[in-house]
Amino acid sequence: MNIRQAKTSDAAAIAPLFNQYREFYRQASDLQGAEAFLKARLENHESVILIAEENGEFIGFTQLYPTFSSVSMKRIYILNDLFVVPHARTKGAGGRLLSAAKDYAGQNGAKCLTLQTEHHNRKARSLYEQNGYEEDTGFVHYCLNVPAK
């Protein structure tokens, strides 16, 4: 298994995995939209995508979004997406992607990686905790949906 940073030319091959990831979160299938979204993020250097590849097949990915902490005056990466295809979930790809994300963040001067997952997603929560992530009980997170104008 090889973990590497995605290039813009990988967007079409990552799109089916990204589409499955979105479907897990109850979004309608949109393969064309998935590819366009990924391509735009990569072209505009708005995210970093790390991919797990085995025998020429993409079996997983994680997507990191850069942001900053005003308090610490340091970079933070938001690990927004992590997905491994079902037939490869026992091969350690998720852990290897998390390790690669940690290495990438460290090499780029980040203070930390943050992420969120659904409360009921016990498998993901267990994986994150096995890889050193701790639930942040010191802060409350809010979300405001903004209507399009």
Swiss-Prot record:
It comes from the Bacteria. Its EC number is 2.3.1.-. Residues 1-149 form the N-acetyltransferase domain. PANTHER family: AMINOALKYLPHOSPHONATE N-ACETYLTRANSFERASE-RELATED, AMINOALKYLPHOSPHONATE N-ACETYLTRANSFERASE-RELATED-RELATED. Signal peptide: none annotated. This is Uncharacterized N-acetyltransferase YhfO. CDD domains: NAT_SF (cd04301). It comes from Bacillus subtilis (strain 168). Keywords: Acyltransferase, Transferase.
